[in-house]
């Protein structure tokens, strides 16, 4: 997901999306441990999405506009 797309979400929607992405990352890690995960790059992409969401939430908290 692109940061420009995420900036259109409200804070509450971003927080919900963050929780969803964290759950998704946990599931991916379990699948990796069990040997069921075929596409390991999904872990990397999910971590990046989490970082983007946290960055946007922090920008709003500090009042930084982009």
Curated annotation (Swiss-Prot):
It comes from the Bacteria. One of its GO terms (biological process) is translation. Keywords: Ribonucleoprotein, Ribosomal protein. SUPFAM superfamilies: Ribosomal protein L29 (L29p) (SSF46561). One of its GO terms (molecular function) is structural constituent of ribosome. GO terms for cellular component: cytosolic large ribosomal subunit. The keyword ATP-binding does not apply. InterPro entries: Ribosomal_protein_uL29 (IPR050063), Ribosomal_uL29 (IPR001854), Ribosomal_uL29_CS (IPR018254), Ribosomal_uL29_sf (IPR036049). Belongs to the universal ribosomal protein uL29 family. This is Large ribosomal subunit protein uL29. It comes from Thermotoga maritima (strain ATCC 43589 / DSM 3109 / JCM 10099 / NBRC 100826 / MSB8).
